[in-house]
């Protein structure tokens, strides 16, 4: 999860987030090289009064600075399109969970079970226990099996919300009257925190999301108790 004064992205927990981290580094490297070149040229122009008259109207130079940016954009676009298609791909999910956004809490329904649903509210600051995180803890966590494909169906009952868990590379809008879907797969157990990422009213900041990724055997025990 995030920590104070963090500069980079959160550690990846899912294959999609790992791909996003690689794409981020790839794009940042290209941007850094371009910025360095531009700053170098500007510094040369500011520190010398010499002018190359042969480059004032050179077709070759114009050709280069037209083709080169096109190549750079292609190098950025191709990996981006690949990841976009990966994020939309859904192959035989092992479990489906429906989440509904409300002002200002989330409700969850495990559609593969007959009667397994609950609401998830933020725990107020004055009720937190030692070691719990302010504005991020909830009274009912979403327990999911790790190393399995889980499909999330996301919608809203009132206004626009957005269901986001950064360490899993997830951010899907919750739109009234529309059912969006995304998939997740965590590669290791743990607690993963997120928040509503769409301004939805006065208590927008108080809609945390907590996913508890556990081994399949523990999940089966938990679901049997909950049902």
Swiss-Prot record:
The chain crosses the membrane at residues 15-45, 60-87. It catalyses: 4 Fe(II)-[cytochrome c] + O2 + 8 H(+)(in) = 4 Fe(III)-[cytochrome c] + 2 H2O + 4 H(+)(out). SUPFAM superfamilies: Cupredoxins, Cytochrome c oxidase subunit II-like, transmembrane region. Cu cation A1 binds at residues 161, 196, 200, 207. This is Cytochrome c oxidase subunit 2. Residues 46-59 are mitochondrial matrix. One of its GO terms (cellular component) is mitochondrial inner membrane. InterPro entries: CcO_II, CcO_II-like_C, CcO_II_C, Copper_CuA, Cupredoxin, Cyt_c_oxidase_su2, Cyt_c_oxidase_su2_TM_dom, Cyt_c_oxidase_su2_TM_sf. Its EC number is 7.1.1.9. It is a multi-pass membrane protein. It is an enzyme of class 7 (translocase).
